[in-house]
């Protein structure tokens, strides 16, 4: 039997507060190989992320990936690290702080599925503050088992250890949420007004293995639906935007088209002015700031591109905070 964690002895009225948890993927504590290795290990041993039997995957993971990749990843993190810390952690913390300011009757916190602040630590803190109800918002508009599913798993793992369990609601997806779409539209239009506009807009989402989609993961379909709604809001014709998937890992077939492949192909097709936005990322991170903003620019120019603009994520954009407040209010329902 699992041991239950000791909990504060609080009366019902003392456990009647409502909390909102913004849950993102995670980040190492520092841009060093020593910090990256345990982060990668926790991420890549999650059965939601790598759906291979342990006997096959673990020798590869421990023999190759965790030996070679930490140093390479640490170098990439060094390029984008803020003075305050990891961009993903910094921006997610700002989102939580902005939400807390708008909803002062609630306890609002953020946590990471992998790394710090951990779900275990934050839920313990919330329990100590008298939270008996918890709304979990995984910061992924489009549902994928390897992101949203893994985030909810972490919360459920902690519920298994609670003697007096919290009431929990989760937001599984919001890929077609009007506030989310409008926030992106306004953000992109403001960027174009200030920095100019390319001939084509690339909407790059994080990729998933094709097998995941074949087995029922709705993620690629939800990404394409988000892109369609955003393109319509921006009044783009079909030839003015393209949907792609980035961050492939390993040798398995992933959903296509590949963002990296398109960086090489588009200039040869006459597209030499490109803007790139990542709708599935609500906060800038390694995959957007290094892979797209830096490496993507280099790949596009090497292929013959002439103009490349990376449009930052929503981060703590006021329109996105408005949408986040509305999303929380809708899902809190009678808890408010």
Swiss-Prot record:
* Keywords annotated in UniProt: Cytoplasm, Heme biosynthesis, Iron, Lyase, Metal-binding, Porphyrin biosynthesis
Residues the entry annotates as binding Fe cation: 206, 287
Superkingdom of origin: Bacteria
What EC designation does it have?
Answer: 4.98.1.1
Q: Which GO terms describe its molecular function?
A: ferrochelatase activity; metal ion binding
> Which Pfam family, an example, fits this chain?
Ferrochelatase
Pathway noted in the entry: Porphyrin-containing compound metabolism; protoheme biosynthesis; protoheme from protoporphyrin-IX: step 1/1
- Chief subcellular site? cytoplasm
| A GO cellular component entry from the record | cytoplasm
Q: A GO biological process this protein is involved in?
A: heme biosynthetic process
What SUPFAM superfamilies does the entry give?
A: Chelatase (SSF53800)
Q: Which family does it belong to?
A: Belongs to the ferrochelatase family.
Q: What does this protein do?
A: Catalyzes the ferrous insertion into protoporphyrin IX.
Name under which the protein is recorded: Ferrochelatase
Gene name per UniProt: hemH
């Amino acid at each position: 039997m699992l041991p239950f964690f000791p909990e504060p002895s609080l009366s019902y009225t003392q456990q009647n507060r409502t909390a909102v948890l913004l849950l993102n993927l995670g980040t190492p504590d520092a841009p060093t190989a020593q910090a990256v290795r345990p982060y990668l290990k926790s991420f890549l041993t999650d059965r939601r992320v790598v759906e291979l039997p342990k006997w096959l995957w673990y020798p590869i993971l421990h023999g190759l990936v965790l030996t070679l990749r930490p140093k390479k990843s640490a170098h990439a993190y060094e390029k984008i690290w803020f003075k305050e810390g990891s961009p993903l952690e910094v921006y997610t913390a700002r989102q939580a702080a902005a939400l807390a300011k708008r909803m002062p009757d609630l306890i609002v916190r953020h946590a990471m599925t992998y790394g710090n602040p951990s779900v275990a630590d934050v839920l313990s803190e919330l329990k100590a503050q008298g939270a008996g109800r918890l709304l979990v918002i995984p910061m992924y508009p489009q549902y994928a088992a390897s992101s949203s599913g893994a985030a909810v798993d972490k919360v459920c793992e902690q519920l298994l250890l609670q003697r007096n369990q919290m009431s929990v609601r989760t937001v599984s997806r919001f890929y077609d949420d009007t506030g989310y779409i409008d926030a992106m539209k306004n953000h992109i239009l403001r960027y174009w007004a200030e920095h100019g506009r390319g001939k084509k807009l690339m909407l790059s989402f994080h990729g998933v293995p094709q097998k995941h989609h074949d087995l029922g993961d709705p993620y690629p379909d939800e990404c394409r639906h988000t892109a369609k709604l955003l393109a319509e809001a921006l009044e783009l014709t079909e030839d003015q935007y393209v949907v792609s998937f980035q961050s492939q890992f390993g040798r398995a077939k992933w959903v296509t088209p590949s963002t990296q492949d398109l960086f090489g192909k588009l200039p040869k097709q006459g597209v030499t002015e490109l803007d790139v936005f990542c709708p599935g990322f609500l906060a800038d991170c390694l995959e957007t700031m290094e892979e797209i903003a830096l490496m993507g620019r280099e790949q596009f120019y090497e292929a013959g591109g002439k103009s490349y603009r990376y449009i930052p994520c929503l981060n703590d954009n006021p329109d996105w905070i408005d949408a986040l407040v509305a999303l929380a209010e809708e899902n809190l329902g009678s808890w408010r």
